[in-house]
A protein has these predicted regions:
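Structural signal for interior beta-strand "rungs" in well-ordered beta-sheet cores
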Residues: 37, 103-292
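Terminal amphipathic alpha-helical/low-complexity segments used for targeting or macromolecular assembly
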Residues: 1-107, 112-113, 150, 156-157, ...
Length: 307
């Protein structure tokens, strides 16, 4: 556990001390005490409803309201909310705090029955590869990646690297945010050529690919996404950050599932579709932006007829 008083900077205002084990967004379900940030009363209310939130980082004009809202939560006011929050995350990922915040490194473990091409690059720590898994030449596997049994990782794929998380800090440039989460790949998963699957951002969180899922070449899966079991993802699809794909889903070629969108079990996202809203279970969506497939086709036929 880390106390707010341990990490407060001189220009911050600590209204009430508190303890946290991780950082996260205000609605995160982490199963551990979190420090989150709230930029306005709406997000403050959301954070107060989340039992995992133990400490609050807020702007100065929200400090008193946050302190009075719950006497059991720690509160710290800061001048540059989002930047201060993610700079703190980066600081906690550094050598002084990493063991308390992100855990200790463990040696990489590869099952003796796995078939690893010698031209593969595998991090020396925090990687686990299961029985009978095949990793082809040119694949790169970063730390904090666990691959189950009987998987196939084809040439050129990059697993467990950092994702897109940057903060603009005005004239000072752009702040890159450390990725200290993990990537968990189930059993009998195949990831074909030149795919990218990023690990998650926060240490307690993971990007996840379920058992028996098959991913064709040139697919991008962003940080924090959860892919279910027996999912088929065709070439050049893009799964954006924190998307949730259910079981037995079809994701068509060149399609996009937007950030935080949920695709229900047995749903289909067709060729080139852009799913910017949740996709109900057992439905099929088409188009940009994606709508119900039958409605899309009816509209298309009307246009062809000049109606």
């Amino acid at each position: 556990m880390i106390r707010l008083s341990e990490i407060c900077k001189e220009e911050w205002n600590l209204l009430r001390d508190g303890e946290f084990a991780g950082l996260g967004l205000c609605t995160a379900k982490a199963g551990l005490p979190l420090l989150t940030f709230c930029g306005n009363p709406k997000f403050l209310r959301m954070a107060l409803k989340n039992p995992d939130v133990a400490c609050l980082m807020v702007p100065f004009d929200l400090a008193q309201q946050a302190a009075e809202a719950d006497p059991l939560r720690g509160v710290c006011a800061v001048p540059n909310l989002r930047v201060d929050f993610f700079e703190l995350h980066n600081r906690l990922c550094g050598p002084e705090w990493a063991e308390r915040y992100a855990g200790t490194d463990e040696p990489t473990v590869i099952d003796p029955s796995a078939h690893i091409d010698p031209r593969t690059v595998i991090a020396p720590s925090n990687v686990s590869i299961g029985a009978n898994t095949v990793v082809e030449a040119g694949a790169v596997i970063y730390g904090r990646t666990k691959i189950g049994a009987d998987c196939i990782i084809r040439s050129g794929s990059v697993l467990g690297g950092s994702g897109l998380e940057f903060m603009r800090i005005g004239s000072e440039g752009i702040l890159g945010v450390e990725h200290r989460g993990s990537l968990m790949i189930g059993n009998r998963v195949e990831i074909q050529y030149n795919c990218n699957v990023s690990r998650s951002l926060f240490p307690w969180h993971e990007t996840r690919i379920g058992d028996d899922t098959k991913i064709e070449s040139l697919v991008h899966i962003a940080h924090g996404s959860h892919i279910g079991k027996r999912v088929l993802i065709a070439a050049s699809a893009c799964i954006c950050g924190s998307a949730e794909i259910g079981d037995d889903v079809w994701i068509g070629p060149n399609s996009t599932v937007s950030s935080e969108v949920k695709v229900g079990n047995n749903a289909r996202v067709t060729l080139g579709a852009v799913a910017a809203a949740d996709v109900p279970a057992s439905s099929t969506v088409t188009g940009n932006f994606a709508v119900d497939h039958e409605l899309f086709m009816l509209d298309h036929l009307r246009k062809m007829r000049g109606e």
